[in-house]
Amino acid sequence: MLLPQVRVPQPGLLHSRPHTTALHLQSIRDNKPHKPYIKHYVDTYHCLPLWVASRCLTFGTMSAFFDYQKQSVKTKTCVAMARALGVGTVRQRQLEFAYHTLPDFRNICAHDERLYCAKVGKNNDRGFAEMLRALGTVTTAERLSEYAKAVDGMLGALASGSSNLESKVLAGMGVARSDVTSLIIS
């Protein structure tokens, strides 16, 4: 069974994203990066499955790509995501929230900026708590637990040095320590 084919929006039909997203998707479709696995699927099956195309997409492009899909593809994506994560459902709004929140946090991490007090989104209204919520949508409970353990360990190190510093960091994060520890699977 092939997954949905890549649907590349026409540059003139784009709304809030720059047309470079469409050009990037078109270059993948047209195999401009000359990836052998893309050529194989296009030559053999005359389509490019989404899971193959996703290997060439940046997180931000993948977010825009999801936005451009037909409702039926978005629904199938949510069902596939829920199945892959072993959860009952992933709602489209949750996935859209994750896709619009996580690329900015990924970029913050990639550029060695401060994650704990970062704010992203159009109104700079999404902080660490929203990042945790978005991660909970797109990753397994076990992986989220590993991340929460690492964060809790760092908070513990701060607390042992200065409880005042820990409280300032938690305030900057916009979470209580219990918000982090509640994600840890025993």
State each model region's role.
Residues 1-186:
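Amphipathic alpha-helical interface elements
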